Amino acid sequence: MMHLLFVALLFLPAMARAAACCGGGLPVPALVLGDEKANLSSTFSYATVGTDVNAEGIWKHRQITEQAQTLRMDSAHVIADRFQAGASVPIVRRARNEDTRTGLGDVALNAGYEFLPEWDYSPWKPRGLSYIQLTLPTGRSIYEASDVNQLDNTGRGFWALGAGAAFTKIRGPYDGVLLVDLHRSFGREVRGTPAGDLQISPGWGGTLTLGAGRSFKDVRVGGSLAWIYEDATQVSGGSLPDGALSRYASAALSLIYSPTPDWSASVAYTDQSLFGAPTNTPLARGVTVSYQRRFPR
């Protein structure tokens, strides 16, 4: 069962970046990826942001770093045969110097279908789960932020609809994971900002993640690399210019301990400054601690 928690850990680089600035890709989907009937997960992440990359790809190190902490609760449940549903709720705390803000992040609801079940052993066929996800604008967007350092920006703040798939494969002590998602964020009007009344129009985004690991009895060691992309945001009706497309790559190393099939605990390190050619994004480094409880069918 250790590889199942690792699948969730693959999304944490994006989550760390989302907490540290203004949102990345879709929130972490709450999924049942094993043979259990339901699971409940609790994740705490701590990230620091010390570098910004502008639209031309030029890096600038911050004189004062920002700290972001996220406490996230996830639950997923099989509702009928190969169908399932899940939800995730994040609480975000951001700090810079003595200034601190805490608020609700973007809540996500998702439904999944296991389109490639693993009923018979195959040396090559993976297990496949597709999902759709609805993201609610419960977090405060960067355009609504009133704090001078924009620390009260706790999410993207847009309705978003996405679809994705997770493929997992185990061969002996080794496992591999492929994750893909595509999502569309929908525009909204933001009134009463210092720049005037704004019409904000985001676009498409996507994530591609590859991961692999090896198990040693009750312990699993793994790594992953994720590529995240977001379209430029169009802004009209005020004095703000349009945004620019955002992209970055995030690496993660994880250690998972699972003494029984019913629960797992993990620690992971994520770094967004090691790979790729980032554009228009802050870069974060962070540590994440997770616990997952699984309930058998």
Predicted regions and their residues:
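Short glycine/proline- and aromatic-enriched beta-strand/turn motifs that initiate or cap beta-hairpins
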Residues: 18-69, 137-141, 272, 296
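Short loop/turn motifs that connect adjacent beta-strands in outer-membrane beta-barrel proteins
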Residues: 29-37, 82, 117-128, 172-175, ...
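Residues that define the transmembrane beta-barrel architecture of outer-membrane proteins
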Residues: 36, 67-71, 102-107, 126, ...
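Residues on the lipid-exposed face of transmembrane beta-strands in outer-membrane beta-barrel proteins
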Residues: 42, 73-77, 87, 109-115, ...
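Outer-membrane beta-barrel pore domains and translocons
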Residues: 43-47, 90-92, 114, 133-137, ...
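Outer membrane beta-barrel transmembrane domains
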Residues: 45, 50-62, 191, 195-297
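Long, hydrophobic/aromatic-enriched structural stretches that serve as scaffold segments
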Residues: 64-114
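Outer-membrane pore/translocation modules
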Residues: 99-202
